Amino acid sequence: MIFVLDVGNTNAVLGVFEEGELRQHWRMETDRHKTEDEYGMLVKQLLEHEGLSFEDVKGIIVSSVVPPIMFALERMCEKYFKIKPLVVGPGIKTGLNIKYENPREVGADRIVNAVAGIHLYGSPLIIVDFGTATTYCYINEEKHYMGGVITPGIMISAEALYSRAAKLPRIEITKPSSVVGKNTVSAMQSGILYGYVGQVEGIVKRMKEEAKQEPKVIATGGLAKLISEESNVIDVVDPFLTLKGLYMLYERNANLQHEKGE
């Protein structure tokens, strides 16, 4: 069984794969202040709830866009699983040809999504990930990672309205009953939702025009389903794209080590 861990700025998503299938997954808040023991006890409870233990896990891979948390997570893996985790970063074999000016600038989550997207959906491809930041990644027909777009995430936009405008409340991100809001909350919900739908459609349109291609558009992340229901440019919603990519990277690197006799 392989344990995969994707750490984002707001949430961390964990999963266990068994024989290539995602057996279970969990989501928890990213906490930069937790120790390896606190993470260890939390993961222990999650595993035990599914009738699993640390000993059932034979390999671990971690992707993180939050560097301060990595020390605690690596220590947790070594202390409780007795396994040194594979970390997505320099040295890992992705098979991805990255055409960024500085490939090291590409976030681990974007690399993982690209690996999974190419394997599952082919190319050319646009991957939209609705996280703390919303990222758009373009993979061309030759399966090269060409770059992308980064915008403030949906929740950041909503929080900015709440924190910077004294009379505007904090809202739930959901579809309002109409585009024209009849009260402050519904007006804000409409602005956030349909403003983002417009952003997605506009950016995807421009990316396609610049690439002179008609790539398939894959959406992932917490609010991908909500946005896709209001947009006509998203072809597939895959909520577990990143976890699948992590598993694929683990298998690729484990097989390479096996071939080398390591």
Swiss-Prot record:
Catalytic center residues: D109
Gene3D superfamilies: 3.30.420.40
Cofactor: NH4(+); K(+)
Residues engaged in binding ATP: D6, V7, G8, N9, T10, N11, A12, V13, T132
An annotated GO BP: coenzyme A biosynthetic process
Binding note for cofactor: A monovalent cation. Ammonium or potassium.
Domain of life: Bacteria
Functional pathway: Cofactor biosynthesis; coenzyme A biosynthesis; CoA from (R)-pantothenate: step 1/5
Reactions listed under catalytic activity: (R)-pantothenate + ATP = (R)-4'-phosphopantothenate + ADP + H(+)
InterPro entries, per the entry: ATPase_NBD (IPR043129), Type_III_PanK (IPR004619)
Cross-referenced SUPFAM superfamilies: Actin-like ATPase domain (SSF53067)
Main localization of the protein described in the UniProt heading: cytoplasm
Its biological purpose: Catalyzes the phosphorylation of pantothenate (Pan), the first step in CoA biosynthesis.
NCBIfam families: baf, PRK13318.1-1, PRK13318.1-5, PRK13318.1-6, PRK13321.1
Assembly and interaction partners: Homodimer.
Protein name, UniProt field: Type III pantothenate kinase
Organism for this UniProt entry: Bacillus anthracis
Name of the gene this protein is made from: coaX
